[in-house]
């Protein structure tokens, strides 16, 4: 069984903001594949599907970003999902807008959602699909991550979401982190 989760903040106020890149990437995948998050439990919106013979749970935690780990840990514990079978999709300010990077483990990189997941799972041994949003140039970090993408930036993000769909499909097919890193980094 696989768990694929996008990180973001709940509510319309944050809907299309840079910090909700994880939600947007997951929403793109779900929409392209005719899926919806039809359950509300474990402090998140989720669905369980069978894809290519694999049980897959898609999750968007409805805690705020900094508490994302609570929802993810509840799902992982309930369904007995191993950390290496989890893929977390999130924004990354240390990468250019629209750049994708896969990681199998590692530090949080200062991302509070990732810190929360590490604390709640008790490990950093879970897969990440990081999508770049870059550092702000002339505004605060908070203003930057809570603002939407402009048109040029959105084009780069749309391409990243297309690539993320391929990453998700390969992850579901059982491709390991090394394969994903070689293919997409």
Swiss-Prot record:
Q: Which GO terms describe its cellular component?
A: cytoplasm
For whether the record's keyword set contains Membrane, the answer is no
Known catalytic reactions: an N-acyl-L-alpha-aminoacyl-tRNA + H2O = an N-acyl-L-amino acid + a tRNA + H(+)
Select a single GO molecular function from the record's annotations and give it.
Answer: tRNA binding
Question: What enzyme category does the UniProt record give?
Answer: hydrolase
Q: Which domain of life is it from?
A: Bacteria
Read off the InterPro entries from this record.
Pept_tRNA_hydro, Pept_tRNA_hydro_CS, Pept_tRNA_hydro_sf
Q: Which UniProt keywords apply?
A: Cytoplasm, Hydrolase, RNA-binding, tRNA-binding
Q: Which residues form the active site?
A: 19
Its chief place of residence is cytoplasm
List of residues binding tRNA: 14, 64, 66, 112
Q: Where is this site: Discriminates between blocked and unblocked aminoacyl-tRNA?
A: 9
What Pfam families does the record point to? Answer: Pept_tRNA_hydro
NCBIfam families hit by this protein: pth
Q: Which family does it belong to?
A: Belongs to the PTH family.
**Protein name stated in the entry:** Peptidyl-tRNA hydrolase
Supply the source organism for this entry: Lactobacillus johnsonii (strain CNCM I-12250 / La1 / NCC 533)
Name of the gene = pth
